[in-house]
Amino acid sequence: MSNIQTGYLNAQDAAALDVELMSTPGFSLEQLMELAGLSVAEAVYEVAFGGDGEKASNDGGRKKRVLLVCGPGNNGGDGLVAARHLAHFGLESTIVYPKQSSKQHFVNLVKQCEDMGIPILQEIPSTNDSSKVEETKYDVIVDAIFGFSFHGTAPREPYATAISQMVQLQKEQSVLLSVDVPSGWDVDGGDLTGTNFHPDVLISLTAPKLSAKKFEGRHFVGGRFLPPSIAEKYGIQKPPYPGVSQVMEL
């Protein structure tokens, strides 16, 4: 881990910053979700091809396979956007989206993924069928279930089961990457409920949340779009993003 300092946001400031982005500089929710999803996709690509050791190593020249588990809110929307970008990047995306939102923007995101030929499932495929081992083998699992609005209670179904299944896939050598906050973690306090959910990689969006101090894996940040005035107001130090990248590893 580097010594790069970015500042941390508590849950209250993270919510306030989101609101301010959609008022003072006039970002739309759709813009922010697109920028966030692109950042997630870049981090996944870096993990799949550049880096988490043997877990994401090349396997006989086949396409890298990514399973994105999406929740009902904006974090899930980030996952949908990421799935589309990953497909454009040449990876094989599969989406698990148990509770699809009826909001038009989310409906549009689903349609865009369908147009890319991305499968959208209701639940994570079972790994118990030995004849389908290759079909359920993923290089990277993306946890895009809950974001910074989650507060410290045990996740409910169907997400509790999904989280357990992601942990199992992680044990079977998939790299587990969480979007913004590991699902089930309190935004400020971390894993307060003892979920035993510990991703290999975290991609913090806009800026790391307080719970990221409890995270011990690879840590990326994606917040290159943040206006300097807002960054200063919330005590965020933007890292020196390389080249044209939207993400940087801390």
Swiss-Prot record:
Matching PANTHER family: NAD(P)H-HYDRATE EPIMERASE (PTHR13232:SF10)
- What protein is this chain from? NAD(P)H-hydrate epimerase
User: Which co-factors does it depend on?
Assistant: K(+)
Keywords from UniProt, A to Z, are: Isomerase, Metal-binding, NAD, NADP, Nucleotide-binding, Potassium
Q: Would I find Cell membrane among this entry's keywords?
A: no
- Binding positions (K(+)): N75, D143, S183
What organism does this protein naturally occur in?
Thalassiosira pseudonana (Marine diatom)
Task: Indicate the family of this protein.
Answer: Belongs to the NnrE/AIBP family.
Return the cofactor note field.
Binds 1 potassium ion per subunit.
A GO CC term assigned to this protein in UniProt: mitochondrion
